[in-house]
């Protein structure tokens, strides 16, 4: 069997989502069409060195409109949004904007990395993606700061406001947060 005979390498018209392609192109501007697949983005990606995340593949699939392939790929969530790819792109493609939009579409379709859901759960519970711990409180005291930063940790009423916003936007449902148990479903 040759490479051209492999079924998974064939792009079929039915796999192309033109609406998704247009959304992606709107997020990345006209620049997305200028990508000539040089690989600078993938070569500069710190996450791509240690994970299966390949920026160039995402951009190529986005250009074609392969929505299902992009949003169902767990590697989509391995981007740290450090902008290394975008800063080095010789064609000025808005790569990170494309990745963010693809993640939004993935989340709406029920594809979200468990680690990202866990961070969302921390935000719901504490108002922070990374809750403060004893070691951090001790370090804050050691450098002359109060144990708690002036955030939801100090102002519980602010956490109530954060939670109202979360409920109003449906973020809790998006990540599968159960208010009764305080856990993800």
Curated annotation (Swiss-Prot):
Sum up the protein's function in the record's words.
Part of a complex that catalyzes the reversible reduction of CoM-S-S-CoB to the thiol-coenzymes H-S-CoM (coenzyme M) and H-S-CoB (coenzyme B).
Please name the Pfam families in this protein's record.
Fer4_8
Which residues are noted in the entry as [4Fe-4S] cluster 1-binding?
Answer: 35, 38, 41, 89
Record-stated family: Belongs to the HdrC family.
Q: Which GO terms describe its molecular function?
A: 4 iron, 4 sulfur cluster binding; CoB--CoM heterodisulfide reductase activity; metal ion binding
Please provide, in alphabetical order, the Gene Ontology terms of the cellular component aspect for this entry.
Answer: plasma membrane
E.C. designation(s): 1.8.98.5
- Gene Ontology biological process terms from the UniProt entry: methanogenesis
Q: Which gene encodes it?
A: hdrC
Name the species this protein comes from.
Answer: Methanothermobacter thermautotrophicus (strain ATCC 29096 / DSM 1053 / JCM 10044 / NBRC 100330 / Delta H) (Methanobacterium thermoautotrophicum)
4Fe-4S ferredoxin-type domain: residues covered: 25-55, 68-99
What are the names of the required cofactors? Answer: [4Fe-4S] cluster
- Judged by the first EC level, this protein's enzyme class is oxidoreductase
The chemistry this enzyme catalyses reads:
coenzyme B + coenzyme M + 2 reduced [2Fe-2S]-[ferredoxin] + 2 H(+) = coenzyme M-coenzyme B heterodisulfide + 2 H2 + 2 oxidized [2Fe-2S]-[ferredoxin]
Which terms are listed as keywords in the entry?
Answer: 4Fe-4S, Iron, Iron-sulfur, Metal-binding, Methanogenesis, Oxidoreductase, Repeat
Keyword Iron among record annotations: yes
Protein's name in the database? H(2):CoB-CoM heterodisulfide,ferredoxin reductase subunit C
Q: Which residues bind [4Fe-4S] cluster 2?
A: 45, 79, 82, 85
Q: How is the cofactor bound?
A: Binds 2 [4Fe-4S] clusters per subunit.
Its pathway? Cofactor metabolism; coenzyme M-coenzyme B heterodisulfide reduction; coenzyme B and coenzyme M from coenzyme M-coenzyme B heterodisulfide: step 1/1
Quaternary organization: The heterodisulfide reductase is composed of three subunits; HdrA, HdrB and HdrC. It forms a complex with the F420-non-reducing hydrogenase (Mvh), which provides the reducing equivalents to the heterodisulfide reductase.
